Amino acid sequence: MAVAGGPAGKGRDISLAALRRHDPYISRIVDVASQVALYTFGHRANEWEKTDVEGTLFVYSRSASPKHGFTIMNRLSMENRTEPITKDLDFLLQDPFLLYRNARLSIYGIWFYDKEECQRIAELMKNLTQYEQLKAHHGTGAGASPVSLGSGEGKEADILRMLTKAKDEYTKCKTCSEPKQISSSSAIHDNPNLIKPIPVKPSGSRQQRGPRPGQTSDPEPQHLSLTALFGKQDKAPCQEATGPPQTLPLQQQQPEKFPMRQGVVRSLSYEEPRRPSPPVDKQLCPAIQKLMVRSMDLQPLAELPESRPCTDALRAACAGPAQTGSPRSHALAAPGTQKLLQVQSIPGAENRCEPGAPAPASSATTPVSLAQPTRLSSALPPQTPGPRALPRPAPPGPGPGHQPVTGPGEVSPRELLRRLQAVQQEQQLPAPGRPALAAKFPTATLSTRARNPLEPWRDPPPSTEQPAPLLQVLSPQRIPAAATPPPLMSPLVFAQPSWAPPQERSRAPLPPGNQDPAATPTGLLLPLRTPEPPGTPGSALSKLQLQEALLHLIQNDDNFLNIIYEAYLFSLTQAAVKKTL
C-alpha cells in the first residue's frame, strides 16, 4: 500500500509525540494536511454547519485495532476531532471538500486549504477503508470484528479493542431483529447495519444503492453511499441517509393509527350539529323577542287589554319615555330597555303579568293623592345608588317634557341597540344593594335619576320636603299590564322643587339626572307654580357630577350641543372683533 509523502524529519517527530499524548497506540504518521476545517451536515436544517474544529489533519497508523485513524488537532479549543478508519466509513471527494460518513450515520465534510492535499488525503482514506473492508471480509467473515488482525501484536490488554468487539457483537445481535422493533434513538445511531433493505424496503431501492468502487467482491449489502447522496451536489437531504431506519417503522404503524384518527374526526363532526342551543327565545314575551332579533321598532300588538297579557306592561316602560319628539326623549328611553332586559333575566316574569290590571300611570287631570299610590317597578336593588344597576326593571315613570306627543315607533334601531349595550355594561358592574323601601323623590324626577346610575342618592333639605305621594318600590312579580297609557304628568307637579331666583337659575344645583334647564324643551313642560324661597339653599354639584352631566348632555342632547356650538362661534366672532379694534 503506497502512502503519500508529507512533512518529514524533526517536525513530524514533534507532531507524533503530541499525538501520542492523546493516543499512546499511535505508531507513525502516514500523511498530514496543513490547514483543514470540519463541517457537519444538519439533519433538520438540511444544510452544512461549521463546527469549532479547525487545524492540522494527521492520518496515522496504530498498533491496536482499529489499525488506522485520523485526528484534527484543533487550534480553536482543546477538543480535537478523532475518527477511526474502519470498514464502515464512506468517503466522497468534492474539491475542496472531503465528505465522509461514519458508523454512527453522521455526515461530515472536511474543507482543505490546499486542493492537492485534499485529493491526496481523499485517495489515502479510500485505500485505507478498502483495506479494512477486505481484512474484515477475508479474516472472520462478513460483519465480524477486525480484532483478529491485531492478534499478532501480543496479548496485551487493549481497552479500545475490547470496546470495538463489544460494539460489533451488539451490532450483529441487532441486525437479526426487525427494524420496526427498534424504537430508541441510540439503537438507530449505534447500528451501522440498520438501513439494510431486507425486511421492508421494496426491491426497487436496491437498484438505487450502487456499490462503491473496489467493493464488487463484497457480497454483503452496503449502506447508502455518499456518491448517491452527494454525487452531483454539495448539499443533499439528510433524509436519504438516515430516512430508511426511521421512516420504515412509521410506514408500518401509519395504517394502524390512521383509522383511529379518522374515527375521532367523525365523532366530532357528528356531535357538533347535535349540540342543543339554549332555548332562550322560547320563554320570552314577543316584545323581548323582537328586541333580541334587532327589530326596527317595537310595534304595539293590539289596543284591547284582553289581547295584551304581557306586552303593554313592558311597552309602558320602553315606549312611554322614548316616544317623544325631542332628542332628549331618546336618551331617556334607557330605563325602558333596562326593564326589558330584566324581565328576560328573571325566570317566570312573563307569567306574572296580570292582564286587565290598572295602568301604571296617572292622568294629567287627576291628582295622584285621590288615587292609590302609583305602582312602579324599580331597577334599584337594595342599596344601589342608581336605578339602572342590578337586577330589577327600571321605573316607567315620566319626567319633565315626556308627554306622549307622537305615536309609537319613534326610537330608531341604532339608538335602541346603543341603549341596550349601555344597560348590559352597567348590569355587569357590582353594586351594593339598597333595601326595597318607599322612595321619596324630591327635585329629581324618575327619568332624570334613571339617566345617571352612578349618581349618589341625595335627599333634599328638610324645609323643601312636603307631603307627596310615595312611589313604592315593587318586585318584578307586581308588574301590571294596562291599556293604552293616558297623557302623563310631570312629577314636578307633586314635588316641590328647590327655589332659586330667576336671575340665578343657571347657578342653581342641577338635578341628579344632569338635565340642563336651558336645554329642556319648554313646550313639553306643564306650567308650574312659582315656589317660595326655602329656608336653606340646595347643595351644589361636585366636579364629577358636573362632568357626567355635561358629557351626557353633549352625547344625547342635540339642542344642548347646538347651544354650546353657537356660543363657541359667538365667542370667536367677538374675539375677532376685539382684535380688529
From Swiss-Prot:
Entry's EC annotation: 3.6.1.62
Lineage: Eukaryota, Metazoa, Chordata, Craniata, Vertebrata
Subunit and interaction comment: Interacts with DCP1A.
Compartments where found: Cytoplasm; Nucleus
Gene name tied to this protein: DCP1B
Main location as per UniProt: cytoplasm
UniProt feature, compositional bias: Pro residues: 382-401
GO cellular component term, pick one: P-body
Biased composition (Polar residues): 204-219, 368-381
Reaction(s) catalysed (UniProt annotation): a 5'-end (N(7)-methyl 5'-triphosphoguanosine)-ribonucleoside in mRNA + H2O = N(7)-methyl-GDP + a 5'-end phospho-ribonucleoside in mRNA + 2 H(+)
Signal peptide stretch: none
Any one GO biological process: deadenylation-dependent decapping of nuclear-transcribed mRNA
InterPro entries the UniProt entry points to: Dcp1 (IPR010334), mRNA_decap_C (IPR031953), PH-like_dom_sf (IPR011993)
Residues that bear Phosphothreonine: T366
Protein name: mRNA-decapping enzyme 1B
Start and end residues of each stretch annotated as Disordered: 181-222, 236-258, 349-411, 427-468, 498-522
MF-aspect GO terms: 5'-(N(7)-methylguanosine 5'-triphospho)-[mRNA] hydrolase activity; enzyme activator activity; mRNA binding
Keyword annotations from UniProtKB, A to Z: Cytoplasm, Hydrolase, Nonsense-mediated mRNA decay, Nucleus, Phosphoprotein
Modification Phosphoserine, positions: S145, S269, S326, S412, S475
Its biological purpose: May play a role in the degradation of mRNAs, both in normal mRNA turnover and in nonsense-mediated mRNA decay. May remove the 7-methyl guanine cap structure from mRNA molecules, yielding a 5'-phosphorylated mRNA fragment and 7m-GDP.
Domain of life: Eukaryota
Gene3D superfamilies, per the entry: 6.10.140.2030, Pleckstrin-homology domain (PH domain)/Phosphotyrosine-binding domain (PTB)
Bias (Low complexity): 244-255, 355-367
Family: Belongs to the DCP1 family.
Protein's UniProt keywords contain ATP-binding: no
Catalytic class of the enzyme: hydrolase
